[in-house]
């Protein structure tokens, strides 16, 4: 349960209809095996003690008592197990029969939750035997214990307060207003559904969508354990379709007829973070009773997949669709700004690198959207000391293929003059030497925009903004930053997508060569005609920084948890041992705090994804905040590296 991870399982053991002794033994066996795997939450199907298909046998006292005897045996077996378990059984209470979920832990019966919505249509006729549950919670005696009984029950783990369990049963989820909605608003971060959903054509897809959508709507983890092999096939077939979803994402699934076990880790901290930032999620716990329980804290081995590129969809079709959407968003944002400013030109500094390439592609799309000629895009290349033949050539070819206006301004003489003015020794290749060139380029672009009645389009991306890898009032400044919401890992895929759909072979080839060019500001003199300054050698791999950026901003995770996630995401990558992951994570935090002053005065630019750094929107942070707490937490991971 360290870092908010809860190992959970939805289990569908084989059973025999009305054979409580056999079913109990199956449940105990699977419960013990699950506990041995480190599972802390185990959910079994609806009526797993008796079988769902007992029909009018549910009204027989012998079956009812057999279920209670089985429940007592499970309680006894659970005393030695460090797991919360949920099992389904018929329960006679208040003179009526209820379809119940029993919640138990270490021999204690924590609560009994009756089903709210009883289906009485098609193949279902539960109202023939059962009574709907009430929201009112009362205490009844079951298995010699005083137990809360009612639908308005929550179960909270003392050792991990972010793990709060709510319960509903099968049809409850399929109703117009599921009880889980109220459970979540009352504080439940995890919903367990004990189900006996029969299999019909197309139902598995619908069921999966229900679980995914409910977990997204409630910002929760959702476990769905459905009855499987052994149920009566007199009129129906049950397939043991088990599902575990988290905030709209399916984490684990036992497909129909595939064995009946879905198991993964839920991230309760992540769910809490989502709710904390969502002001539309308004808590309401009126009428709810919360029962507390204890589990031994454990460091679960992560089996859930951690995406090493969270900004980039892995599926090629989805990635292409995402790229097209993002390019349209960027182009639309720029088109609106060009219209509003009555700009005659869109002025872009072109280096032959990725970011300026993407900005140019976006500007061309914007002009086409406005019905204007692409020659209204004015690309300016400004070679100086670090410019290489490769990047210069690529810039010219790209502009020619896109049919934009092109001009070259050699800034070397201006930079020499500027250095003479301020007394800069040009043999000293320091930050002044580098930044002086960047600021001269911005001066040229701004004045060119004034001369042509245009607007300077910024090229800097989200990753550079996070790291502060931009010259203050140099490339940091523009009149509209189209890439401000796009991280570097995504920039590469946007350019690659444009290469894939390029109208000509020459355009495709130049885009591919730009993709193959090392990322560089080209501010230091070239060595033998080659780039002498590679960004990722200086600030670290962008795929790592984008990973860190995502989890820092999207969920507010601490350094230790992010380090753990990085180890899982980049496992097997020889170039990323723990020491390297740590080094660049520490570098990320140091730069992120130190460079906030640059982000506090960002030009306008469109929000693209859920992570952005606009000081007018998603990220408001004082420029003089201290990073000490975060760096101290990192120091605990590698004291020798501090």
Show where each model-derived region lies:
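Enzyme catalytic cores with a strong preference for nitrogen-chemistry domains
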Residues: 1-347, 365-374, 401, 406
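ATP/NTP-dependent adenylation/nucleotidyl-transfer catalytic domains that generate, transfer
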Residues: 6-7, 161-163, 220, 232, ...
